[in-house]
């Protein structure tokens, strides 16, 4: 049996971590993104760990047809997630394929996505399994809270030490 084929749509933080985990488990992983600089960065940093490709509509469905799992990890700040796979396109996917919609908090990136819970996380549409749990980090609340604290503490300390104006002027992450 060959490795699972995983397509990750979105090469941001969430998509990159999903790709790393899947590749680490032996999957054949392709990350799709619309940012050429981001794709170059992923190739430079993770070269060989997983493949990257530009996320055109045609390329997305072409790769999705062969995938065992498709992870939707797209984010457009301040906007609803784009619908990347339509209900009609489900029939083109492998029977039993799994859609994981990490963008469900922004409305979902698959037309057939609907928010689920940790207690009842999966459902099936036309032979395709869906996992669309909102607030996925809630499954490991203590760990995710500690991680969030560790990630945000340097910013809080800078704000406390410098005041908001100077901290924002000094740090491009706070400025954004």
Where are these regions (language model features)?
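Glycine-rich phosphate/diphosphate-binding loop of Rossmann-like nucleotide-binding domains
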Residues: 1-75
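Rossmann-like adenosine-cofactor binding region
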Residues: 47-126
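General structural feature for long, well-ordered alpha-helical segments within catalytic domains
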Residues: 5, 14, 18, 34, ...
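Adenosine-phosphate binding glycine-rich loop
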Residues: 104, 108-176
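Alpha-helix termini
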Residues: 23, 28, 39, 81, ...
């Amino acid at each position: 049996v060959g490795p699972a084929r995983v397509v990750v749509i979105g090469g941001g933080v969430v998509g990159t971590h999903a790709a790393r985990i899947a590749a680490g488990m032996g999957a054949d992983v392709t990350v799709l993104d619309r940012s050429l600089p981001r794709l170059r960065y992923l190739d430079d940093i993770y070269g060989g760990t997983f493949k990257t490709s530009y996320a055109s509509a045609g390329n997305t469905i072409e790769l999705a047809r062969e995938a065992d799992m498709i992870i939707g990890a797209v984010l457009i700040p301040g906007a609803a997630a784009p619908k990347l796979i339509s209900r009609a396109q489900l029939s083109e996917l492998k029977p039993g394929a799994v859609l994981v919609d990490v963008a469900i908090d922004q409305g979902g990136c698959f037309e057939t996505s609907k928010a689920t819970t940790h207690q009842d996380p999966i459902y099936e549409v036309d032979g395709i399994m869906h996992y669309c749990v909102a607030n996925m980090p809630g499954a490991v609340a203590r760990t995710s809270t500690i991680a969030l604290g560790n990630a945000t503490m340097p910013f809080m300390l800078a704000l406390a030490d410098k005041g908001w104006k100077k901290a924002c002027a000094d740090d491009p992450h706070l400025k954004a």
